[in-house]
C-alpha cells in the first residue's frame, strides 16, 4: 500500500529499574518497620521482672551507689566490692532509676536508648556508604535478633555495641569529610567513643 512503511518498527518495553522497585509502597512499609521496632523496644521494658543473677546484680550495685553516694567504688550488700566490671553500666542504671523511680523499665531504659541510638548511627553510616538506600543498613541492624534482645536485658552488651558503633560512624563521617575542616572533630569523637567502648562498659 502506498504511504505505508512495511519495515517492522522497534518497540520498547517499560521496565522498572532496581532503584525504582525499591521506591514502591513495599519500600515505604519496610521503612516504617524501623520506628515500629524502636517503639517495641521501649514498650516492653517493664513487662517482666529482673532476671537473676545478672540483672539483679547490676541493679543492686546501682541502688548501692544511690544509697551510699559513692559512684566510684561499686559495692554489693553494703560491704562486698564489685569491681569485675567498669562502672558505666552501673552509672547508667543508677541515673535512670534516680530520674524515673525504682521500676524495671527504668533500669532497662538506658539499654533501649543505646539500641535506638545504634540504629540511628548505622543509618548515618548508610547515608555515606549506601547513599541510594540509606535506610537499608538501619533496617538490617534493627531486625537483628541479638541486638534487639540485648536491648531488653541489663548487661554491658548494648552499651558496648553503642560505643563501638559510634566510633565506626565517626570515622566513616570523618573519611567523608576528609577535605573539610570538620573532619578533625569526627576523628576526635571517634577516638573518644573507642576509649569509652574499651574502658567504661567493659566486656560481657
Task: Please provide the spans of the model-predicted regions.
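Membrane-integral, polyisoprenol-dependent glycosyltransferases
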Residues: 17-204
